[in-house]
């Protein structure tokens, strides 16, 4: 606040603009809400499931190309697709509107799996070849755990949710930058952006844990042993090595903490499903 010539207070125009920007951003975000039939959560999402599907289908070819292309190993590709479809067709995921397809990427070094909006799911050869209990034979329960986790991201609409959250963060960051603009302090914008980044990181960690929980549910519903998802966490831990990024600064929770949450989810869903 600043005093005007008459001794009263006036609000700087930049603050007024910032307040309007912030109010508009918040109204837009909270005005778009729907209940997720699988998770039961109220989500603030502007995209429709049809838009998510279209976005995923459009992005899939480019994503595969950036990751070294699709694998030429037809046998392993077939297994990935079969296990993925078994998880979907025998779980609550079947009752969602998404078009699920499972792809094996040729990258032998990167240990990763991810989902695009609408049901396009990828796993690298680098991760697939590590999903073994004896160093040689593929453990399909582990594969089901990885794919079930990614199906969880799709079902929970995490990509669409993330986009809405990023729009919210960007809108509020713009408002804060406008309100705190000071030509003599060029760091003000950097501070505002840092806050937005921290918000995004927090959401990502929560979404990963929710996908672990859903992955356990889908494994049980489709006849796989969810205890093997704990084994996947051990593989990820070993692959990361001793110099892992501290959990708070990582988008993904630490594998050790994920193992604890998965074990709790196993007991939760075995009770709910009567397994």
What is each stretch, according to the model?
Residues 1-275:
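A Zn2+-metalloprotease active-site environment signal
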């Amino acid at each position: 606040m600043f005093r005007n010539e008459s001794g009263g207070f006036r609000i700087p125009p930049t603050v007024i603009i910032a307040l309007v920007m912030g109010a508009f951003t918040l109204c837009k975000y909270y005005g778009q809400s729907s209940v997720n039939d699988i998770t039961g959560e109220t989500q603030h999402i502007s995209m429709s499931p049809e838009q998510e599907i279209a976005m995923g289908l459009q992005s899939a070819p480019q994503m595969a190309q950036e990751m070294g292309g699709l694998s030429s190993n037809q046998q392993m590709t077939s297994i990935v697709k079969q296990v993925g479809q078994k998880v979907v067709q025998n779980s609550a995921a079947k009752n969602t509107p998404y078009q699920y397809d499972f792809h094996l990427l040729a990258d032998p070094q990167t240990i990763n799996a991810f989902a695009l909006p609408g049901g396009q799911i990828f796993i690298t050869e680098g991760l697939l070849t590590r999903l073994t209990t004896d160093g040689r034979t593929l453990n399909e329960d582990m594969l089901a755990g990885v794919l079930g986790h990614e199906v969880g991201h799709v079902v929970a609409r995490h990509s669409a949710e993330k986009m809405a959250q990023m729009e919210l963060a960007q809108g509020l960051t713009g408002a804060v930058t406008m309100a705190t603009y000071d030509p003599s302090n060029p760091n003000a914008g950097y501070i505002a952006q840092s806050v937005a980044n921290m918000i995004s990181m927090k959401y990502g960690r929560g979404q990963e844990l929710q996908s672990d929980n859903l992955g356990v549910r889908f494994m049980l519903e489709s006849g796989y042993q969810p205890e093997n998802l704990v084994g996947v966490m051990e593989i990820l831990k070993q692959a990361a090595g001793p110099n892992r990024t501290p959990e708070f600064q990582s988008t993904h929770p630490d594998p050790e903490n994920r193992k604890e949450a998965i074990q709790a989810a196993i007991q939760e869903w075995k009770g709910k499903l009567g397994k």
